[in-house]
Amino acid sequence: MWLASRSILVFILSLFLLSTSLAEARSNHGYGSELIQSVATAELSPEAIIALKLIKQGGPYPYPRDGVVFGSFEKRLPKQQRGYYHEYTVKTPGVRSRGARRIVCGQPVECYYSDDHYETFKRIRE
């Protein structure tokens, strides 16, 4: 009984220390930028590749909100001044609205892909 209680206590303490370390990493390094994974352009969906090409050539964009300033209120991208990031829609087959997929870019071209409406991001590697 004592050994089981001790094991549970060690497990709970380990979880606490891990969560504290992650929270500290996020707060000390500006918006959790160290936690962002990456994705190669070739690994993106065909729709994301088309959107990325339109971004690089400056349009024309299929959605009126494409190119608007992205506020990064979710604080999941590296911290920058307001106006640095702009968002663009990635068309989602079978969805009548804009859907959840986005590409967010800063200047110089530093782009991130989100397939879950800004919950997670992957930096796009050329």
Residue ranges and their predicted role:
Residues S19-S21, E47, Y88:
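Generic signature of intrinsically disordered, low-complexity, basic-rich segments
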Residues I8, N28, I103-V104:
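Small/flexible residues
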Residues K56-E126:
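Functional cores of ribonucleases/endoribonucleases
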